[in-house]
């Protein structure tokens, strides 16, 4: 089954040339972005990498996302990319894995790695084959043009989470650990924005707690802060999955808010790029 783009022309340009230029602008942005284009390693990725990436419209979160894609490119090309995104639509299964076929963007199509999807489905108590949760969801889709820009051909496994409980995060981490046994060069993207629609000062404070949990690689601390500090982070389940995977290192690459782009600091959304390796 081929998934057509749901948010081309909304979150990013629908024309190929305009999309390529928009992604270039995100990388070359020197105020919020890294100010340089990626130079992918000619080698293959040697070990698993986790990547926390934002998923708003490219003009807002693209420069922050570019920091992560720039860094990931230095590690080498992955054999498969698992993209875990939160379910914003309420459609589909609690943990929906797109099992086969391909996803289309204005830059072309990327295949779903059927074998990798099969391993995850067979290793998880919660994951189910599901197309409906993905049809209108943007959080996974917006990562793919960046992947195509950096790596060209790459295969993916999209996972959409309506259930982002600690039990699901731990279960998915175990399933992905089994995936690593067959696909050691996997890149796992946790797609999330951080605190939503509060003022800049409040969002910077709340987002700092999320970054602390990531630096400490502590999923329990992440969930504690979400409740204690009332943080409206949308994709915490994917991040908690990464934090359950026993990565040795975690590095914050860039944090900014929508207010840093628009100048409106009264209601902002927080964006983060971080890697775990």
Curated annotation (Swiss-Prot):
InterPro entries: MEMO1_fam. Transmembrane segments: none annotated. Belongs to the MEMO1 family. It comes from Thermotoga petrophila (strain ATCC BAA-488 / DSM 13995 / JCM 10881 / RKU-1). HAMAP family: MEMO1. It comes from the Bacteria. This is MEMO1 family protein Tpet_0837.
